[in-house]
Amino acid sequence: MADEQEIMCKLESIKEIRNKTLQMEKIKARLKAEFEALESEERHLKEYKQEMDLLLQEKMAHVEELRLIHADINVMENTIKQSENDLNKLLESTRRLHDEYKPLKEHVDALRMTLGLQRLPDLCEEEEKLSLDYFEKQKAEWQTEPQEPPIPESLAAAAAAAQQLQVARKQDTRQTATFRQQPPPMKACLSCHQQIHRNAPICPLCKAKSRSRNPKKPKRKQDE
């Protein structure tokens, strides 16, 4: 009787070992699948970060182009102001010469009339460009400044976004790896090829339906 009881205990132990072993194998298989999914997601995250870096570099390149353009505009504005100052000085000098020439010509014309000679032609009669009115007209054209066109909203927004991303990136590098805030996972829209959130059902730019690059696997039923 004792032997039978011992045999039954051993059989129960063997059954329990078998059930626990099967349960362990199932958990091991699930664990292996989870690790594979983890490694795959890490690779995708690395790709997303690389793509984000490329986009950031592209935006910063546009910001640098805008900075250089504004620097050139400032240099040209200073050059134009200097040229206008030089033109104003020349105009004042021309006006003084006109003022000196006019009474002298009137005196010469009066002397010529006493001798029965015709008066000399005026400067404007000889050449239009020697007229004081011509120089005044030119001055008005010189002082007309070209209107600077406004920066397109999309380009201005891109420049502002690039600067914000650069500041956020510098702040992020000062944090430890444990508490580092990760950017949201992104993917390329199949229609417009713009970067959108990985889980976005519809592209916010072109309104096309989005399909996830890595669709979620259906959950397995928990083992009883």
UniProtKB/Swiss-Prot annotation:
Keyword Cell cycle on entry: no
Entry-linked InterPro entries: ZF_C4H2 (IPR044069), Znf-C4H2 (IPR018482)
Effect caused by changing P201S: In WRWF; causes a decrease in synapse number and density
GO terms for biological process, alphabetical: nervous system development; neuromuscular junction development; noradrenergic neuron development; positive regulation of DNA-binding transcription factor activity; positive regulation of neuron differentiation; protein monoubiquitination; regulation of transcription regulatory region DNA binding; spinal cord motor neuron differentiation
Top-level taxonomy: Eukaryota, Metazoa, Chordata, Craniata, Vertebrata
Keyword Signal recorded: no
Role, per record: Plays a role in interneurons differentiation. Involved in neuronal development and in neuromuscular junction formation.
Name this polypeptide is given: Zinc finger C4H2 domain-containing protein
Domain of life: Eukaryota
PROSITE patterns, sorted: ZF_C4H2
Coiled-coil annotated spans: 11-104
Disease: Wieacker-Wolf syndrome: A severe X-linked recessive neurodevelopmental disorder affecting the central and peripheral nervous systems. It is characterized by onset of muscle weakness in utero (fetal akinesia). Affected boys are born with severe contractures, known as arthrogryposis, and have delayed motor development, facial and bulbar weakness, characteristic dysmorphic facial features, and skeletal abnormalities, such as hip dislocation, scoliosis, and pes equinovarus. Those that survive infancy show intellectual disability. Carrier females may have mild features of the disorder. Wieacker-Wolff syndrome, female-restricted: An X-linked dominant neurodevelopmental disorder affecting the central and peripheral nervous systems. It is characterized by onset of muscle weakness in utero resulting in fetal akinesia, arthrogryposis multiplex congenita and diffuse contractures apparent at birth, global developmental delay with difficulty walking or inability to walk, hypotonia, variably impaired intellectual development, poor or absent speech and language, and dysmorphic features.
Molecular function in Gene Ontology: zinc ion binding
Pfam families in UniProt: zf-C4H2
Effect after changing R18K: In WRWF; no effect on subcellular localization; no loss of function; rescues interneurons differentiation when expressed in a zebrafish heterologous system
Tissue: Expressed in fetal tissues, including in brain, intestine, lung, kidney and muscle. Isoform 1 is expressed in numerous fetal brain regions. Isoform 3 is highly expressed in numerous fetal brain regions and spinal cord.
Encoding gene (name): ZC4H2
One cellular-component annotation, GO: neuronal cell body
Main location: cytoplasm
